């Protein structure tokens, strides 16, 4: 019987596996952001777990979500094109079941396995038979297909078909493989899970050895001992991270019900490892600066989290290595004018010492807020420090270095003390030619700095003094509400209104109308939370943002957009 898989299908599978490998590599490069999904209890038949697992949502769900997004951007015909193409290439596939890809390394080399939801794979292959190089059905029902000079083996296992480059790989797939990947496709259109500890230790060690060898050769060629020490410390941390890492997960999904594009990531370390201790030491704490979290914010960033002893130690090593590199750079002939290098280094060392003293307090607490709108831009921030008095002393010392120039900023220290915070004022004349800046800030830009025993504040913009005092007052009212470790939110509408008030634009006006009709006014949100031995990060892009992109794209035949 001559049944085979088309070359296009073989190439498609190969390209998909390559894309998955690239995604896993990119995810590994951003380990600090991590992902939430728990590892499935399901294993392969040899008791191991796949090194890499990919779950793709059902074709029906994928088509519905693509239709939703293309409708948001005002191009529903694109969703129709996708649906037609998907139907042409997925005939015979169960449209309501997810697709899975597993990569095992039981043999010491990657073995990709594709799992397709179909009850009759022979029917699918028969339709594509003419595009195969060769095909043979073996006595046990396995179908061997010649594709681009290699053989792919396909087996029917219940309601799914399994394809791999060896029969041994097919034997690794359990009778019901769906639990291996279904959780990844349940909440996302695409889910990826990387089990780092399933990579054989010799392969991990070989990778680390090659990385260290390449580093050594690069440093020998560079000849900068300061940079070498810094890079060596960073390399040690990367090596520790790779050895301690357990699981990475990535999920990309379209949530039509919530009206958002969702990206979830998570990272976990091996229980009992140094990295796990660092992750476990990060827990939400009461915050002095939580008032930045407000509904009318154009943007805010907030973090309030404990810092583990292991993280403090690692931070100290990093600061020391960077200071050594800076000292070496400033000591080079001609780096700075005579005497200036020592002075600059003195200030840098003071800042580094203050930063480390703050970290050694075992917590990080900060908040940043931007308010914007028509002819309006304000900013306020607060930051925990170990000694606000040292910050004030450093600022006063630096102020003596400001040149005697009428265009230079004017500083007024010890303006007043408000609720335990000493306020200082900075004024800067806005040149007459800067019409847009004067429209926002007036003839003089005013900024305020506040220093307290354990905090530093800053604000600028019209009305920034009142905004700063309001922010200071709010710090005493935090009731220790449990919040995420860190969170960020950006809302498009206030920035669009600001841009349009500075210089009116038809395209911006059109986007404003579109975003104004959306529920979230164009929000982008990020939340970071702790999980056992790790952390998870969720990004949400609201429907208003997607609609804004569509509104900014010129309609075919209408000409290019003004920007």
Residue ranges and their predicted role:
Residues 1-15:
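N-terminal secretory signal peptides that target proteins for export/translocation
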Residues 16-34:
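Bacterial N-terminal signal peptides
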Residues 25, 480-481, 485-563:
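In a subset of proteins, long, contiguous C-terminal domains/tails are tracked
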Residues 39-148, 183-247, 266-375, 399-413, ...:
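Structural boundary/hinge residues at secondary-structure and domain interfaces
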Residues 50-54, 99, 112-116, 143, ...:
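One face of beta-strands
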Residues 88-96, 108, 118-157, 193, ...:
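Short Gly/Thr-rich strand-loop-strand
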Residues 100, 349-374, 388-389, 405-412, ...:
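Long compositionally biased, domain-poor regions of proteins
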Residues 144-218, 441-519:
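A conserved glycine-rich beta-strand in the N-terminal activation segment of trypsin-fold
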């Amino acid at each position: 019987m001559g049944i085979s898989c088309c070359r296009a299908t073989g190439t498609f599978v190969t390209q998909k596996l390559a894309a998955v490998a690239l995604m896993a590599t990119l995810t590994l490069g951003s380990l600090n952001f991590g992902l939430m999904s728990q590892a499935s209890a399901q294993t392969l038949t040899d008791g191991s777990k796949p090194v890499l697992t990919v779950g793709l949502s059902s074709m029906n769900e994928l088509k519905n979500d693509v239709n939703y997004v293309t409708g948001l951007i005002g191009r529903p015909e694109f969703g129709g094109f996708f649906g037609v193409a998907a139907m042409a290439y997925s005939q015979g596939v169960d449209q309501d079941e997810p697709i899975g890809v597993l990569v095992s390394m039981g043999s010491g080399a990657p073995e990709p396995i594709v799992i397709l939801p179909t009850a009759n794979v022979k029917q699918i292959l028969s339709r594509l038979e003419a595009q195969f190089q060769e095909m043979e059905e073996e006595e046990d029902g396995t179908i061997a297909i010649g594709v681009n000079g290699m053989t792919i083996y396909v087996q029917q296992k219940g309601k799914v078909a399994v394809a791999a480059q060896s029969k041994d790989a097919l034997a690794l797939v359990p009778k019901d493989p769906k639990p291996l990947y279904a959780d990844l496709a349940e909440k996302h259109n695409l889910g990826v899970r990387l089990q780092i500890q399933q990579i054989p230790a010799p392969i991990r060690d070989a990778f680390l050895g090659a990385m260290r060898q390449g580093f050594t050769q690069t440093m020998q060629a560079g000849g900068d001992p300061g940079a070498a020490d810094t890079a060596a410390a960073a390399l040690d941390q990367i090596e520790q991270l790779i050895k301690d890492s357990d699981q990475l997960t990535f999920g990309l999904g379209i949530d039509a019900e919530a009206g958002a594009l969702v990206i979830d990531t998570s990272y976990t370390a091996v229980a009992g490892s140094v990295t796990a201790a660092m992750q476990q030491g990060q827990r939400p704490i009461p915050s002095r600066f939580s008032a930045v979290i407000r509904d009318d914010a154009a943007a805010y960033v907030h973090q309030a989290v404990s810092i583990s002893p292991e993280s403090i130690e690692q931070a100290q090593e990093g600061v020391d290595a960077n200071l050594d590199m800076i000292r070496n750079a400033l000591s080079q002939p001609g780096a700075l004018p005579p005497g200036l290098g020592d002075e600059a280094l003195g200030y840098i060392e003071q800042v580094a010492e203050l930063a480390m003293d703050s970290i050694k307090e075992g917590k990080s607490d900060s908040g940043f807020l931007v308010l914007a709108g028509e002819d309006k831009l304000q900013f306020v921030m607060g930051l925990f420090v170990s000694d606000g008095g040292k910050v004030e002393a450093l600022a006063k010392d630096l102020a003596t270095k400001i040149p005697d120039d009428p265009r230079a900023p004017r500083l007024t220290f010890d303006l007043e003390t408000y609720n335990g915070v000493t306020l200082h004022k900075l004024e800067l004349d806005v040149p007459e030619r800067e019409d847009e800046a004067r429209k926002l800030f007036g003839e003089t830009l005013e900024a305020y700095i506040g220093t307290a025993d354990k905090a530093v504040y800053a604000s600028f913009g019209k009305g920034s003094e009142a905004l700063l005092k309001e922010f200071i007052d709010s710090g005493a009212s935090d009731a220790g509400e449990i919040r995420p470790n860190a969170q960020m939110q950006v809302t498009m509408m206030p920035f669009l209104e600001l841009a349009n008030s500075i210089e009116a634009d038809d395209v911006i006006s059109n986007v404003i109308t579109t975003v104004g009709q959306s529920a979230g006014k164009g929000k982008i949100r990020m939340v970071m939370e702790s999980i056992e031995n790790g952390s998870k990060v969720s990004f949400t892009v609201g429907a208003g943002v997607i609609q804004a992109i569509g509104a900014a794209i010129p309609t075919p035949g209408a000409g290019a957009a003004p920007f």
